[in-house]
């Protein structure tokens, strides 16, 4: 890929609940290659953090990594959400972080998607569910997601295809975010634009 002339900071969120493994290694390599092209990116692996459970508690009251992680998303120029497939969908740890994240943190922000499963049977599961959730936030989701499976790795090392599609996604996210930089969203997302519904008066007599 050609050098990247954008100045967008990417945050790569890996929604893993286990110790760093193949997906961590693949994303870490993609970040290094992006840096060589001039794109600044960093990896936040949820498997290495202590995040509170999204139970309505204000972020400032959580004595863990939740507030700092959400702040990293808020300050990002663009975000890449990566998840292993669990039960045909995204991981619970990533969904929990999304539940902790306020709507303005992702509103109008470019988001790329990466998922990984043992086979191709569930390649649309996490993508479909994440697109539904991100539409609620009013995020700008890249039209093509990356899906990796076991055949994309040899002895835990990502192969040529994995590196190529990740590099294309990183470059596409950075370019799209740069193109939209300063462009105000046309409409509020559903989460902010919905009006409260008043209860109907009960009929009498």
Identify the function of each model-found stretch.
Residues 2-39:
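N-terminal beta1-alpha1 ligand-phosphate binding loop
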Residues 26-27, 126, 169:
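Hydrophobic alpha-helical membrane-association signature
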Residues 15-17, 46, 116-117:
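Cofactor-binding loop segments of dinucleotide-utilizing enzymes, especially the Rossmann-like FAD-
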Residues 61-137:
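Helix-loop-strand module that forms the ligand-binding subsite of alpha/beta enzymes
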Residues 14, 45, 145-147:
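Residue-level recognition of beta-strand->loop/alpha-helix junctions
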Residues 10, 41, 111, 141-142:
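Hydrophobic/aromatic residues located in beta-strands of well-ordered beta-sheets
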Residues 61, 141-205:
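Glycine-rich phosphate/pyrophosphate-binding loop and the adjoining helix
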Residues 46-63, 154-158:
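N-terminal beta-loop-helix "entrance" segment that forms/cooperates
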């Amino acid at each position: 890929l050609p050098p990247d002339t954008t100045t967008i900071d990417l945050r790569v969120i890996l929604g893993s609940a286990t110790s760093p493994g193949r997906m961590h290694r693949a994303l870490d390599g993609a970040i290094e290659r992006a840096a060589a092209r001039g794109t600044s990116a960093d990896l936040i692996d949820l498997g290495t953090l202590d995040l509170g459970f999204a139970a309505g508690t204000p972020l400032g009251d959580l004595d863990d990594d939740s507030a700092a992680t959400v702040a990293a998303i808020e300050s990002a120029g663009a975000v890449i959400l990566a998840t292993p497939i669990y039960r045909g969908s995204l991981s619970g740890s990533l969904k929990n972080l999304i539940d902790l994240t306020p709507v303005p943190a992702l509103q109008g922000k470019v988001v790329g998607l990466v998922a990984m499963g043992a086979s191709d049977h569930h390649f649309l599961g996490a993508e479909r569910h994440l697109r539904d959730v991100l539409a609620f936030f009013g995020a700008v989701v890249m039209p093509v997601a990356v899906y990796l499976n076991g055949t994309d790795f040899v002895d835990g090392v990502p192969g040529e295809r994995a590196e190529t599609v990740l590099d294309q996604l990183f470059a596409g996210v950075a370019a799209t975010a740069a193109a939209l930089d300063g462009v105000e969203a046309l409409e509020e997302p559903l989460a902010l634009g919905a009006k409260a519904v008043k209860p109907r008066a009960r009929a009498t007599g």
